[in-house]
C-alpha cells in the first residue's frame, strides 16, 4: 500500500495535485474499509452456516486488510492518532484470530462495530478537505477523480 501512496505522491505538482493525492488516499482507505467490512459480514454468514473453510478465507482476507491498514500508518508524522490506530489494528487482528478459532459471533460483532466506526470517520474526511477549483486546462471531471 505504501508503494501506491508513493506513486500518488510522485504525481503532479501544485495545490490541486496535492489535494487530489489526499483525496485518492482517502478513497483508497475507504475502499479497504469497505472490503474489510464485507469480509466480516461474509465471515458471519459462513460461521452461521458452519462453512469453516469459507469462514477462514473471509477472516484471513479481513486480517490482511487490517494489517495493510496498519502498515500504511506513518507513526512519525501521525503522532498519537497513528499510534492509537496501530494499537487498535493490533487488537482487531488478535480478535480476528480468536473469532477464527472459536467461531465467536459476539467478538466478530465487536470487530465489526469498531471497524464500522473507523470507516464512518473516513467517510466524513472528504467533507473536511478544502474545496478547490481545477487547475487551468484540467476538465472538471478529471479534477473530481
Regions found by a protein language model. Name each.
Residues 1-42, 48-49, 54-60, 67, ...:
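N-terminal intrinsically disordered, cationic/polar leader segments
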